[in-house]
Design a protein with these regions (language model features):
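Structural signal for conserved beta-strand scaffold positions within catalytic alpha/beta enzyme cores
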Residues: 33, 75, 131-134
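Phosphate- and divalent-cation-binding pockets in alpha/beta enzyme and binding domains
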Residues: 22, 40, 82, 119-120
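Active-site-proximal, substrate-binding regions of enzyme catalytic domains
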Residues: 42-71, 82
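Active-site neighborhoods of divalent-metal-dependent phosphate/nucleic-acid chemistry enzymes
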Residues: 70-116
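Short, well-structured N-terminal submotif of metal-dependent ribonuclease cores
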Residues: 1-36, 51-60, 124-125
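Hydrophobic side chains within alpha-helical segments
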Residues: 9, 38, 43, 50, ...
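Acidic, PIN/NYN-like endoribonuclease modules and their adjacent C-terminal/linker elements
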Residues: 2, 100-135
Length: 135
């Protein structure tokens, strides 16, 4: 069975953060993500550069690692309408709901380190579809 991961999980593969070990353990699973995951991860690394936490060269090297990560990047287009519907239902941004729409399509779940996303999706009809990393 595939598992959907979001950028917050993938970033832990290249940054030393809490739950890094749990994120690394997921690399043994069959992982999928909407193609936007890589842009989101690169944007987060850019923010780390802007804050002076890593260099631009380090960010580029880490994005290269993510490009080669064991994640099947899937097209967003087939899931955008469902993501918009989910976003309006749970009151959470569409870009996160694309991960949820992909998980629903593949009858699986999303693993995230985004507590707000997990809390927004904690509704009876979505039970267990968005899980916090390490829980």
């Amino acid at each position: 069975m595939s598992i959907v991961i979001d950028a917050s999980v993938a970033l832990k593969w290249v940054l030393d953060e809490p739950e890094t070990e749990a994120a690394l353990a997921l690399r043994n699973e069959q992982l999928i993500a909407p193609e936007l995951w890589l842009a989101e991860a690169a944007n987060a690394l850019w923010r780390h550069v802007k804050l002076g936490e890593i260099t631009a060269e380090q960010a580029l090297a880490r994005v290269s690692e993510l490009v080669n990560a064991p994640v099947a990047s899937l097209p967003i287009e087939p899931h955008v309408l469902r993501a918009l519907n989910l976003a309006t239902e749970i009151g959470h941004p569409v870009y996160d709901c694309v991960y949820l729409a992909l998980a629903l399509y593949h009858d699986t779940h999303v693993i995230t380190d985004d507590r707000r996303f997990a809390a927004a999706a904690a509704q009876p009809e979505l039970a267990g579809r968005v899980r916090l990393l390490g829980s």
